[in-house]
């Protein structure tokens, strides 16, 4: 089977970090191409792609009207002649003139207001979580659920460089984008933890970059949390997979989230997690059985749950059960295999 995956960029977001793992798994038994349209390509992510995958970098400038990258895309497709063209974001399929093969779209997030306009163009729609599936069904489009996957075996789970300052170290790994990722909620919660509840024996590490970085840093300064909150900047996936295990608590305060790859990664590193009680992350912790959750957008409830963790510490049995749950349900090999089964079903 010949499979062509198309995506706008190869940065450090959840889709981009997962795609190399998916195509590399599929390339073990199939001919696979990965086509990146725009010129935003993170070299450390690209380096993860298996050598058997045909990588096509079109190097289009975002928003460019130059037709040449689109012509190159379709010339490649005509030569490669894929059985499956698999798109991962809105408007990608509009670039494809190639008339053959079946078209598949993975829906990677909730709050999809524009994407449904193009859903009828696909032979199969795939949602990454029950939350995304339910939303898409509610919009009138049949779809199946295939959970996102992570390379569990590559994630270390034994502390290798533990912190030696006697403090609890919390972490969030994501784009600095308060509208979706909710870092402002977490900062307000940590303000309460320190100034209302009187706990200051912690350090919060934000890993990532984004448009809201300056605003968040100003917020931290105004709340007198400069000693408790550190902005680590962008770290590559290797750093994340090797260092997550050294932290005491992973916190994901997203306002909305289709899935939450970094939540699964933290669990694979055997780190306790605290997430907002939205459906994507909540699904990963089995409705709250395998981790902590707080009321979405509620900084006070988030603070209360952090204080509970500070007082009670990690629950080893829960951490181990969560780890096994992620191994069984969210390993990337399972995701890649299920995609192949879908391709085969629509090619019959």
Model-found features: residue ranges?
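A conserved mid-protein helix/loop that constitutes part of the nucleotide-sugar donor-binding site
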Residues: 16-21, 168, 177-195, 211-217
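Short hydrophobic beta-strand element within catalytic cores of glycosyltransferases
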Residues: 35, 272-275
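Carbohydrate-associated surface elements
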Residues: 131, 149
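Aromatic "clamp/platform" in nucleotide-sugar-dependent glycosyltransferases that forms part
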Residues: 255
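Conserved acidic donor-binding segment of nucleotide-sugar-dependent glycosyltransferases
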Residues: 287-299, 308-313
């Amino acid at each position: 089977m010949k499979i062509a995956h198309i995506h706008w960029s190869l940065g450090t977001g959840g889709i981009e970090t997962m795609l190399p793992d998916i195509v590399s798994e599929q390339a073990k038994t199939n001919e696979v191409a990965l086509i990146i349209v725009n010129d935003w390509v993170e070299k450390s992510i690209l380096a993860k792609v298996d050598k058997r995958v045909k990588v096509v970098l079109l190097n289009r400038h975002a928003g460019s009207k130059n037709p040449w990258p689109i012509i190159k895309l379709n010339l490649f497709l005509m030569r490669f002649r894929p059985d499956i063209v698999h798109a991962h974001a809105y408007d990608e399929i509009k670039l494809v003139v190639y008339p053959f093969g079946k078209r598949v779209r993975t829906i990677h997030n909730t709050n999809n207001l524009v994407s449904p306009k193009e859903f009828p163009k696909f032979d199969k729609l795939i949602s990454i979580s029950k939350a995304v599936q339910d939303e898409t069904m509610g919009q009138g489009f049949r779809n199946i659920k295939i959970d996102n996957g992570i390379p569990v075996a590559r994630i270390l789970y034994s502390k290798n460089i533990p912190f030696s300052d006697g403090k609890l170290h919390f972490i969030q790994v994501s784009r600095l984008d308060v509208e979706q990722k909710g870092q402002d909620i977490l900062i307000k919660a940590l303000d309460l933890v320190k100034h209302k509840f009187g706990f200051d024996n912690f350090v919060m590490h934000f890993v990532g970059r984004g448009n809201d970085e300056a605003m968040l840093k100003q917020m931290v300064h105004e709340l007198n949390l400069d000693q408790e909150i550190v902005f680590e900047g962008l770290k590559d996936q290797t750093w994340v997979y090797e260092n997550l295990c050294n932290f005491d608590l992973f916190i994901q305060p997203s306002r909305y989230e289709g899935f939450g790859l970094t939540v699964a990664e933290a669990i694979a590193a055997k780190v306790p997690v605290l997430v907002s009680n939205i459906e994507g992350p909540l699904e990963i912790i089995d409705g709250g059985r395998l981790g902590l959750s707080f009321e979405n957008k509620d900084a006070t409830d988030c603070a209360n749950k952090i204080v509970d963790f500070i007082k009670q510490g990690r629950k080893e049995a829960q951490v181990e059960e969560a780890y096994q749950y992620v191994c069984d349900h969210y390993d990337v090999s399972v995701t890649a295999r299920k995609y192949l089964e879908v391709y085969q079903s629509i090619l019959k």
